[in-house]
């Protein structure tokens, strides 16, 4: 299936594949830090019986086709559901270091972003990938702090004198991970790219100076990810905001957001790519995404990006979407 996807991407003119290799505190590659993913064998920690290494295979096949391969990780997430909490392998960092686990109100588990040891584990995982695989980039998804209730008071207690505002402390800890992750990548392989695909809204102008003319959930307030600061300080080689809305959408207009991000990135050396909701085209619930409307919307969005001097490209999420809806 991987080969078919890469052939399809090559035929359609794509130049880069982003492969998710750490969905939830696990690995789709041989790792001494994270257990083998259950998505491979059905049981976390169980290696493929034939020695298959998905990341090694994907890198080789992408490079054969003249495409780049970026390894995509979810840095903090340990489980997607509380139903998975009892299915973790013994060598999962959340099992060996339960003191680092943060659980949200739905029961999902995360490595606590407020713990320095959590950051160290994530950084070692990044170094392991860059050392052992010829990847062209390390890519982080949009999951940072949980978006629902959690208790991180014990971690905050250690920092509260320096950070009287807990929200500022949380953002500072995530920013530390981002800046250190870039350094970790560049120390091993200077030409390897590092980027993030955050929520399309940094903050709304109505509640945060400098925010976009929107009114939706934001990375700054909901996930404690100061993505605008990361661009301004050039902690990233590129940023790829997930602008999964349509032109004219109330509270989160596509055109408004790509122009806002263009304005943020233009004075910097950070490249701007746009994450497109290919999975919605022809199948979304809103009228703008249904049937031919959705195909036209996606096509128009890609054209708008191509016309902007500040946007370097688009990523279509997810991989089967353009093929299935061609």
Residue map of PLM features:
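Conserved small/polar residues in nucleotide/adenosyl-binding loops
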Residues: 3-7, 317-324
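An active-site-proximal structural segment forming one wall of the substrate-binding cleft
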Residues: 9, 61, 110-143
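Aromatic-rich peripheral "rim/lid" segments of glycoside hydrolase catalytic domains that contact
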Residues: 284-297, 319, 323-326
């Amino acid at each position: 299936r991987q080969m078919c996807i890469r052939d399809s991407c090559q035929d359609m003119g794509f130049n880069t594949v982003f492969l998710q290799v750490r969905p939830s505190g696990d690995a789709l590659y041989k790792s001494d830090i994270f257990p083998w993913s259950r998505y491979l064998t059905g049981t976390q920690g169980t290696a493929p019986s034939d020695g298959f290494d998905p990341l090694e295979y994907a890198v080789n096949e992408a490079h054969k086709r003249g495409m780049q391969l970026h390894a995509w990780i979810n840095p903090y997430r340990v489980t997607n559901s509380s139903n998975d909490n009892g299915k973790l392998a013994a060598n999962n960092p959340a099992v060996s270091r339960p003191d680092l686990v943060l659980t949200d109100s739905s029961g999902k588990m995360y490595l606590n972003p407020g713990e320095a040891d959590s950051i160290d584990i994530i950084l070692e995982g990044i170094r392991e990938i860059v050392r052992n695989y010829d990847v062209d980039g390390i890519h982080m998804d949009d999951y940072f702090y949980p978006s629902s209730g959690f208790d991180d008071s014990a971690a905050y207690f250690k920092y509260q004198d320096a950070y009287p505002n807990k929200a500022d402390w949380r953002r500072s800890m995530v920013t530390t991970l981002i800046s250190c992750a870039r350094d970790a990548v560049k120390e091993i392989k200077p030409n390897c790219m590092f980027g993030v695909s955050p929520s399309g809204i940094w903050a709304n102008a109505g509640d945060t100076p400098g925010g976009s003319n929107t009114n939706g959930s934001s990375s700054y307030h909901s996930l404690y990810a100061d993505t605008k600061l990361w661009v301004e300080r050039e902690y990233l080689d590129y940023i790829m905001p997930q602008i999964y809305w349509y032109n004219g959408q109330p509270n989160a207009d596509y055109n408004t957001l790509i122009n806002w991000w263009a304005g943020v990135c233009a004075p910097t050396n950070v490249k701007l790519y746009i994450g497109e909701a290919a999975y919605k085209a022809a199948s979304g619930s809103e009228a703008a995404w249904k049937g031919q409307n959705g195909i036209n919307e996606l096509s128009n969005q890609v054209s708008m990006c191509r016309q902007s001097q500040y946007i370097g490209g688009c990523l279509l999420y997810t991989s089967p979407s353009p093929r299935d809806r061609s």
